[in-house]
Regions:
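N-proximal low-complexity "stem/linker" segments adjacent to membrane-targeting elements
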Residues: 1-31, 35
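Active-site nucleotide-sugar/metal-binding loop of Leloir-type enzymes
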Residues: 38-51
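Anion (oxyanion) recognition and catalysis
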Residues: 17, 70, 189
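Conserved catalytic core of nucleotide-sugar-dependent glycosyltransferases
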Residues: 41, 62-169
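Active-site neighborhoods of divalent-metal-dependent phosphate/nucleic-acid chemistry enzymes
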Residues: 169-179
């Protein structure tokens, strides 16, 4: 984790606490970001939290960015950030339905088709709808593996057996590869979320 990311998280936790919003911090170790995101989502679904905030290890942000994400009461809100390529170019990984007709919504929001999960706020209802519409995404593990993963996410019950779904996965369709975050956006959009 970059120092700037850790400072962003600490400042955000402080701002949330001062606003009376309870927040919890959860991280996992995994060489696969898809597996890590699915594990974290599983732990979130077992919790009594309403929202999950995804934060990549190299993203810097202000507490105000997160507070603004909570205001509009949308199911999914992301704060796009520059693509980590050429520092002299400004490029964002967002997809608009019609880039020539971008409508500014209340709270200075815009609707996008796809966006990055590096700073994405997701309401629990999103995953509940995805579970209902896509039971085939359920991941099964041997008991010994489930026990290990439950410990990793601090689950007191069998969260892995109940909530481990493949929400976050890369896709390859029509010769186009998408990372797990853009594929998640597409999955949610297909489910009318």
């Amino acid at each position: 984790v970059r120092v700037e990311t850790m400072i962003s998280l600490l400042d955000t936790f402080s701002a949330l606490g001062k606003s009376g919003i309870e927040a919890r911090f959860q991280t996992v170790k995994s060489s696969l970001v898809t597996h890590a995101r699915n594990l974290l989502t599983c732990g979130f679904l077992q919790s009594d939290c309403d929202h999950m905030l995804c934060v990549d290890a190299d993203v810097q942000f202000t507490p105000e960015a997160v507070m603004r994400m909570l205001v509009p009461k949308e199911f999914i809100v992301c704060t796009p950030y520059r693509v980590k390529e050429d520092p002299l170019k400004t490029k964002y990984t967002v997809k608009f339905k019609d880039p020539d007709k971008i409508k500014i919504l209340p709270w200075d929001m815009v609707e996008i088709e796809e966006g990055p999960a590096g700073l994405m706020l997701i309401h629990k209802i999103v995953f509940e709808k995805l579970i209902d519409k896509h039971p085939e995404l359920k991941i099964e593990f041997k008991d010994s593996v489930k026990e290990k993963m439950n410990k990793e996410i601090g689950a007191t019950e069998d969260a892995i057996g109940q909530y481990m779904y493949n929400f976050w996965d890369t896709t390859f369709n029509d010769h186009e590869w998408k990372g797990e975050d853009l594929a998640f956006s597409e999955l949610a959009r297909r489910c009318s979320i």
